[in-house]
């Protein structure tokens, strides 16, 4: 991991020191200790009756990957959080890289991250583009989405989704907990 080599820290320690700690994201981590496991939201999955039921602990449920400790951490998956913690991260982005006096990113870095870098490679009709980690809304009408030009966000496992709309001074976090998430129109 580049972050580990440059910083001399494990990836989880780097995130804690540079992002999670300064933003006071106290409920965000790569694994849960036994005392926190009971706070984990249940995952639901489609059943054979056309409805939804609580998923088992296997591949569709939360499974053992949430239990720790572990020594390997991914920069692209596996971080557990709460809606309120993740909203703090998004608010930092909305604020141009700062929250409650903690500067995490330079305003120019946030601006670079949230602009379309792929032209029409991501979406051939030009309705949405992709920045450095985010889908960027370029034409709400053509995209069939609510929001302002420049709104950015993405989704994750279990139908989690978030977006930041700078023009409306708004952040949104959805923690649906459904697997697979197909068929949901957020």
Protein language model features and the residues they cover:
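Generic C-terminus detector
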Residues: 179-186
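Short, well-ordered beta-strand micro-motif
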Residues: 135-136, 163-165
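Short, small/polar residue-rich loop motifs at catalytic or cofactor-binding pockets
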Residues: 156-158
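Short, well-ordered beta-strand elements
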Residues: 162-163, 169-178
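Active-site-proximal flexible loops/turns
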Residues: 89, 172, 184
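Short, structured beta-strand/loop micro-motifs enriched in basic residues and often containing a Trp
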Residues: 153
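Short, surface-exposed loop or secondary-structure junction motifs
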Residues: 1-149
